[in-house]
Structure formats: C-alpha cells, structure tokens
Amino acid sequence: KNNFELVFLVMNPGYNDLNYNVILNNAKILDIPITVFKTEIFDTVVDITESPCYLCARMRRGYLYSKAKELGCNKIALGHHYDDVIETILMGMLYGAQVQTMMPKLHSTNFEGMELIRPLYLVREDDIKAWRDYNGLNFIQCACKFTDTCTTCNNEENQSKRVEIKELIKTLKQVNPHVESNIFRSVENVNIDTVIAYKQNGVKHNFL
C-alpha cells in the first residue's frame, strides 16, 4: 500500500469569467478542493504570430512544474488518454517525419526530482466523455483568447492537425476496425534491425 497526498492544482492562464466558472463548478460537483494559481500566459502569447499554441503549451507546463515543486509535489498527473497517444504517433509520422510516442511517464529534465505521469493512458476518449456526461460536468477546450467561447465551441470546427488526424483515423477504422489498437501497438513492435536510422540518448545511428 502506497500512501500519498494529492493536490488538485489548477492554473488560470487568463480565463474569462465564463470559462473560469466552469472549472469552479466542476470542482464543486466533484467536491474537489482545488488549489488555483493565476498566470498571464494568454496575455503573453496573444500577439505572437508564429506558433502561439506551442509557446502557450510550453509555458503552461513550465508554470505547472514550478508551482507543483513549490508545493512540495514530486509528480504531475496529466489527463492525456489513449486517443491522444495514437493521434500523437500518427502526427509524428505524417507531419514530423519521426516515429515516437507519448510516454506514460517521464522524468523532467528541467525540474530535478519531478516526474510526469499519465494515469489515463489506456482510457478511451469516449469513456471519459461518458463519465463527464454521467456526472453532469462541462469540459473546456483551450479557452484562450483565440477561442474565448470554447465552453460551447465544437472542436471539430477547429481545423488543426490533430483534428485532421482524428478524421483520418475514423476513415481508416471503416476499413479496418483494429486500426486504433494497431497504431498503439506499432510503437511496441519496433524492430531496430529494420530501421534505417534511430536516435538513442541524443545520438543518431544511421545505416546509410
């Protein structure tokens, strides 16, 4: 039996009142004692023209690590799920020319002693949505100032690369019902002997 303490940490990067109240209401429904801290991330990235979403994500992660460590935590649990994993695998291949996956846990390189874990790694997105609806919760998406009404927006309308990958997987599933599990397992069955090049510990090994 492992004894541990939980801190339900919420970062407010600059939500409007509507979105912030959604978070507070969810916590009330679940009777969760959240710890909220505020940052100005949305204001910082709103005028960035090149890759604002990437910068925002990096800043959010950094602030979360810093605050968690300040509170004496040694792990951060994020909500990435099974569908996020397979989408990330395909995005890396089709848009990044690389084979890699989202790991279920990893040690921080910038915050000594901190570990990131993903407890929902094997949980399907549809199951999470069903749990949300059963409990009468509302999820916000990014909710930044580019999409300030994201409590009600349809994420399918956001033509991002991830949405494109979601649609591709849906199409492939019509032909092969096992395509999702096959994508997931593909990174479990990498045969180094048949790979032209690979990186290990930052060093590239190339057959050619």
Predicted regions: what they are:
Residues K1-V99, M103, D126-Y134:
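ATP-dependent adenylation/nucleotidyltransferase module used to activate substrates
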Residues M11, P52, L116, L120, ...:
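Conserved short-loop catalytic and cofactor-binding motifs
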Residues N12-G14, E40-F42, S108, L122, ...:
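Short, solvent-exposed coil/turn elements at secondary-structure transition points
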Residues L55, A77, P119, V123, ...:
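A short glycine-/small-residue-rich loop at the edge of a beta-strand within enzyme catalytic domains
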Residues R58-L71, K105-F111, I165-S186:
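Short, basic, helix/turn surface patches
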Residues D84-E164, L168:
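Catalytic subdomain that performs nucleotidyl-dependent activation
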Residues L137-L208:
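The feature marks non-catalytic terminal segments
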